[in-house]
Each structure stands twice: as C-alpha cells, then as structure tokens.
C-alpha cells in the first residue's frame, strides 16, 4: 500500500509540469510543497524566481538554488503551487494548518493560475472536518471567539503560536461549511479577524491528486 508521503510526492512531481520556464511563480507552505520544491529543484527547469509564503519554503528553495524574491519586486506570478488541508469538488479549500494562510491568499491572488497539490485523503465532498484556522488580533481574540461560537463553531486558541505578522490563530472545530464563499466572507467581516483559512474566493484552478493509481488532474466540479 502506498504511504501518504508517497502520494504527496506523486502529486508534487506531476505539478512540475504546470510550471512554465522563465517566469516568476508562487510557492506555498507545507509537507506536500516540500516535495514539490525538491522535484522542481531536481527537474532542471529554469524559472526567474519564486515568491515564498514561509521561511521554511524559502530555506528549501535556497537549497536548490531557486531565487527567492519578494512579491513587491514582481508585477505578477504565472502560477501558484500550494497544498490544502481539505479541498472539495469545486476546488474550494481549507488551508492554514501551518498558520500561513494570510500570506498564501496574498500570493494566490497575485497569480494567474492556482494549482493545488494533495494526497487523495484531502479530497472531500464537504469542507469542515479539518479545523478552520482564523488569524486574529490578540486584543480581539475573545470577541472573535464569541462570534465564532455563535456561528456554530468551537473555537480553540492555538497555544504557543504566533503568525508571521505577530497575530494569533484560533482553530474553529465543528463548523458546517455548506456555503464556503458565504462563510469566508462572514468570518472576515468580524472586527479583529485578519483572515481565515477558507479559500473560496481564491479557489484552485487545477487540483493534482496523488492516488494509488498515480497522479490525477482534476478541474472544478469534476468528481
């Protein structure tokens, strides 16, 4: 039986085909992305540079001599490659288990195409089993948590974690996310919320799924 890491690697290696040469690209964060950076580095493909969403990704890119640039240095990105904690058939996602979802949304929004890579366990019919991360200003944490509780969730502070921007993460369990786009907007309207981990406005254009049968390329609303 294929291990989860092997499935991630299958998806990551396939994703290299979606990277155009001589362009700037965006790179996400997480274990699947680590496999992608390795595959890209070994592929010999030449890119102008990568905008990274985390220190870990930047360090790994440097190991493979892939130039890391700031988003402020480029006018746009050809493609953004990232993983997901959950992804549905519309290619809407929950992301941010690593706490980098604000940076990830910024870079995704600057990219012409979003390619999501994941192992097949992440492909779900409905979002919400994975806790939804919400980045909050520390002084508003209790206020935001009460609002999230009223929405049907069970908020839990991520102990000992501070985001890149110095904020806190509240992980929300048990939310019924039947309408991801509406839920994303409603949570972001709460005063004190910086961003949440629903990617509906920035849904993926392509999903590459690592399966027992190999890499499967999926487009929105395909089963």
From Swiss-Prot:
Q: Which UniProt keywords apply?
A: Isomerase
Catalytic residues, chain numbering: 104 (proton acceptor)
Protein's UniProt keywords contain Membrane: no
Question: Gene3D superfamilies under this entry?
Answer: 3.30.70.260, 3.40.50.1360
Recorded GO MF terms: ribose-5-phosphate isomerase activity
Q: Which GO terms describe its cellular component?
A: cytosol
Reaction(s) catalysed (UniProt annotation):
aldehydo-D-ribose 5-phosphate = D-ribulose 5-phosphate
Q: Coiled-coil ranges per the record?
A: none
Instruction: Note whether Transferase occurs among the keywords.
Output: no
Binding of substrate, residues: 29-32, 82-85, 95-98, 122
Against Pfam families, the record matches this protein to:
Rib_5-P_isom_A
| Enzyme Commission number | 5.3.1.6
Q: Name one GO biological process term.
A: D-ribose metabolic process
Q: How does it assemble?
A: Homodimer.
Q: What does this protein do?
A: Catalyzes the reversible conversion of ribose-5-phosphate to ribulose 5-phosphate.
Family classification? Belongs to the ribose 5-phosphate isomerase family.
The entry's protein name is: Ribose-5-phosphate isomerase A
Provide the taxonomic classification: Bacteria, Pseudomonadati, Pseudomonadota, Betaproteobacteria, Neisseriales
């Amino acid at each position: 039986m294929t291990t989860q890491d092997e499935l991630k690697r299958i998806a990551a290696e396939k994703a290299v085909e979606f990277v155009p040469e001589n362009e700037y690209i965006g790179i996400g964060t997480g274990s699947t992305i680590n496999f992608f950076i390795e595959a890209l580095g070994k592929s010999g493909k030449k890119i102008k540079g990568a905008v990274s969403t985390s220190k870990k990704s930047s360090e790994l890119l440097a190991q493979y001599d892939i130039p890391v640039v700031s988003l402020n240095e480029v006018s746009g990105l050809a493609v953004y490659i990232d993983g997901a904690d959950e992804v549905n058939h519309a290619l809407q996602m929950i992301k941010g288990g690593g706490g980098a979802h604000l940076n990830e949304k910024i870079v995704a929004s600057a990219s012409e195409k979003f390619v999501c890579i994941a192992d097949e366990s992440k492909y779900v019919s409905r979002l919400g089993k994975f806790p939804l991360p919400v980045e909050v200003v520390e002084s508003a944490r209790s206020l935001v948590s009460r609002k999230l509780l009223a929405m049907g969730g069970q908020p839990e502070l991520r102990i000992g974690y501070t985001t890149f921007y110095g904020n806190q993460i509240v992980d929300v369990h048990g939310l019924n996310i039947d309408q991801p786009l509406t839920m994303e907007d409603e949570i972001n309207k709460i005063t004190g919320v910086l961003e949440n981990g629903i990617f509906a406005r920035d849904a993926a254009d392509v999903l590459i799924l690592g399966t027992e049968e190999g890499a499967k390329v999926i487009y929105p609303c395909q089963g």
